[in-house]
Amino acid sequence: MQAVRVVEAAGPGKGEPLEREVRALRRAMFDHAILSMNALPDRIFDRAVREGWKRRSYVSLRTVTRVAPLSVPLWAWLAKEDAARFRLEEFLSDVDGLSGALRQYAPGLLGYAVWLLLFASASACWFAVWASLNLLLRARPALTSDVARLFKGLPRPEIFASGVVLAGFAVPVACGVGIAAAAVFWIALSTAYLRRGELVIGGTATLLLFGVFLCGGFLEAIHPMAGSARQGGWLGGEGYYYRDVSDSRDAGRGLLTGPQWERMARFARARAEMQGGNPRAAESLWTGLIEEGGDLADAYNNRGIVRVRLGKVEEGLADFEAAASLRPAGGRAQWNAYQAYLQEFRLEQAARIQPVAWAGIRSLVPFDYRAEEMTHGELIASPLRVGDVWRTLFTVREEGLREARGSAFHDMFFRPVPGGWVPAFLAAGWVWAALWKLLSRKVWMSSVCRSCGAGTLVVGSREATDICNACRAQVGKGIRGGEERERRGLSISLHRRYVRACSILFPGAGALWAGKELRTMLYGILLSLSAGLFTVSWSAGRLAGGLIGDMQTDIWRAALGAVAVLWLFGAAWGWRSFETVQLYHNVAGERL
């Protein structure tokens, strides 16, 4: 009920009533060993949106940081607002709060780890699509010439060859092939006609797709925890208080098997029992955890709180001292021992540890604990540490390949390749590229001049032959007049139009024709990161509400603007780069 009063007291111009309700809620939270009411900021923000004072909600949300210090969305939203208003001091404070919440709130870390993995996967997929299409367009003229050699007995073989090459692009799309599988196929089609720098782009795209495959397995592994963390599931006990969280069936639902996960589930269940007002059940759970061994400082501290609540002050003090000896810089155990000494009127012992206790709780970022205000025997519980969750997640990642075979990413990006064959399929793309690079030194294949578009048959390194002799000699349309000059002029004009069209539709293509492979790859990475950020944030902005939805909406709008700017820059840069190459070889600026 007190949390509801805080939500109702929030509003523009209600600073003093809200402060009063926040202080009352904080006292109630200490009584139940609740560290943070993470649902409060979202409730207040939703109310502000409904009642039309969203833009004036900053003061209210700043006030509730004292009762929702582990709310990562709250700190991130405040940091965004401070950056927009150029409040440097508040911004730095909010960044400290954000980092502190990420370090200490395990469910928050899970959720943001999922978001980062989705962002990385989306960016990698966009890079693979961008790279594969640009490389296919780069190789298309030479590939069409080689396919036309297969139809040399037919009239106008180049028409049939163009249809075959177009089918190589369109058939995977029409058949519903996953975008990752299609990208590998397109890169494989282009491999024989690429320079070394372009092969690096294709190989990087293939490696990133393997990373996407592994990310799918990783997300599949942590989905049972991340999906229930914000709804008050087994890991939600550190930031939310729900009456049914203490149910053992709820605490273990969706949990991965293994001793690490089972211990973490019991830790969260014991914290939920503390919050739910069941000290005897919590004491039993903490005792069981301590008997198992491992990292015991937090368990000792929490059991000490429970025992003090049960009137077992001596036993509680022993637990606090044990926790302080195991983790001297922890802060919580020293403060709790100090409070217990005061309750027992052991003033000498209290005075001895007072400086350490006061300094310790001041350093517990993002918690705004002020010793001079805490005069009612407030005891500070220990949360489930993020380090435990993160280390255990790394253990789960060893099984990521097995999980990836049945993940949603496999069905979405790699169909119809069977899950067990995806690594072999991606490796085959690499082997194919290596074999064609070796065979190209022995097999005569078509090559197209990067400057004028003239085709020829070459064998060996493409770097030495991708500028024709006429362009090296800078003879323009040629020395001879008549039909030969007209044919060369038409070839130059068509090639120029083709590259310019590619530069507009697929930014960066013109720079590839200009021979700027590594700079083009860096540009593609920036474009893909912006597109990936837009993809993930747009989805989250539509589905999520509260502070997260508001921030995601701002992010996808900024990301969309970045994509538009980068697209225009890439088109102009590619156009200009190719124009510079043609000017250098004396084939630009002429009109038919």
Language model features with spans:
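Membrane-interface segments at or immediately adjacent to transmembrane helices
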Residues: E19-A39, R47, F218-L310, E315
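Start-of-helix register in tetratricopeptide repeats
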Residues: A39-D42, P73, M264, D298, ...
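TPR/TPR-like (Sel1-like) alpha-helical repeat modules
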Residues: R66-V72, A79-Y105, A324-S325, G331, ...
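Transmembrane helix recognition focused on a "late"/terminal membrane span
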Residues: L98, V396-S451, I467-R500, T520-L592
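Hydrophobic alpha-helical transmembrane segments in integral membrane proteins
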Residues: R195-G202, L208-D244, W436-W444
